[in-house]
């Protein structure tokens, strides 16, 4: 589960960098939406992992 959390975080950061720095100006709106989706998935993944009470696996 922690592995997926890290994947969501990396994808969100990459989407944010591409969308918010002007590198992909035409796709900034799409990058912002993808950024928000993956941030939500990251939070859900962290909450599920916390409520399970299991130690994280890498």
From Swiss-Prot:
Keywords annotated in UniProt: Cell membrane, Membrane, Transmembrane, Transmembrane helix
One Pfam family this sequence matches: DUF1328
Similarity section: Belongs to the UPF0391 family.
Bilayer-spanning residue ranges: 6-26, 28-48
Protein location: Cell membrane
Organism encoding this protein: Shewanella baltica (strain OS155 / ATCC BAA-1091)
InterPro entries hit by this protein: DUF1328
Protein name: UPF0391 membrane protein Sbal_1421
Family annotation (NCBIfam families): PRK13682.1-3, PRK13682.1-4
Membrane topology (UniProt): Multi-pass membrane protein
């Amino acid at each position: 589960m922690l592995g997926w959390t890290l994947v969501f975080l990396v994808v969100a950061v990459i989407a944010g960098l591409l969308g918010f720095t002007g590198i992909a100006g035409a796709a900034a709106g799409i990058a912002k939406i993808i950024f928000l989706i993956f941030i939500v998935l990251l939070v859900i993944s962290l909450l599920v992992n916390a409520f399970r009470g299991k130690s994280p696996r890498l």
